[in-house]
Curated annotation (Swiss-Prot):
GO biological process terms held by the UniProt record: cytoplasmic translation
Gene3D superfamilies: Ribosomal protein L6, alpha-beta domain
Family: Belongs to the universal ribosomal protein uL6 family.
Domain of life: Bacteria
PROSITE patterns hit by this protein: RIBOSOMAL_L6_1
GO CC, one annotated term: cytosolic large ribosomal subunit
Entries under SUPFAM superfamilies matching the protein: Ribosomal protein L6
Protein's job: This protein binds to the 23S rRNA, and is important in its secondary structure. It is located near the subunit interface in the base of the L7/L12 stalk, and near the tRNA binding site of the peptidyltransferase center.
GO MF assignments: rRNA binding; structural constituent of ribosome
Gene this chain is encoded by: rplF
Quaternary structure note: Part of the 50S ribosomal subunit.
Protein's name in the database: Large ribosomal subunit protein uL6
């Protein structure tokens, strides 16, 4: 029995949810998000709550139950509050600069890295070592943050690179003579 799946998703005021043709559409103050629904799970919009239950008692349906409830909750949270990830850049000469729909990164390569910002994502650089990625789609925000981080992952000796705010970098000691 999924303990996460049993809890109903509450819909705050100003948010509407509709189910049509196997697609859940959630509209809120920040925008609109959709989710393709699985056949193994039944979804019910009941007033200001969305109930997620397995359609039949198979192992596969129970496996998707909690995940589908969380995906629905992510849609509701996205259209009301949005999601933000913050990246911190550490290293001499490492910088970031948001220029319109591009993020320009200087990461110690012989060239600058130009990262095009996808649709639905907003990138800000409050200072040249901090990158704030925000949007309404949790998956897309995390994906963009991971793609930016991939250009220069933090290394364990000096900690240089791009890391998430609050991420712990396991440090190693250098060679001893």
């Amino acid at each position: 029995m999924s303990r996460i799946g049993k809890r109903p998703v509450t819909i705050p005021s100003g948010v509407t949810a509709n189910i049509a043709d196997g697609v859940l559409t959630v509209k809120g103050p920040k925008g609109t998000l959709t989710l393709t629904l699985r056949d193994e799970i039944s979804y019910t919009v009941d007033g200001d709550t969305i109930l997620v239950k397995p359609a039949n008692d198979t192992k596969g349906a129970r496996a998707f139950w909690g995940m589908q409830r969380t995906l629905v909750d992510n849609l509701v949270t996205g259209v009301t509050q949005g999601y933000t990830k913050v990246l911190e850049i550490t290293g001499v000469g490492y910088r970031a600069n948001a220029q319109g729909k591009n993020l320009k990164l200087q990461l110690g390569y012989s060239h600058d890295v130009d990262f095009p910002v996808p649709e639905g994502i907003e990138i800000k650089t409050p200072d040249n070592t901090t990158v704030e990625i925000s949007g309404i789609d949790k998956q897309k925000v995390g994906q963009v943050a991971a793609e930016i981080r991939r250009w220069r992952k933090p290394e364990p000796y000096k900690g240089k690179g791009i890391k998430y705010r609050g991420e712990f970098i396991f440090r190693k000691e250098g060679k001893k003579k």
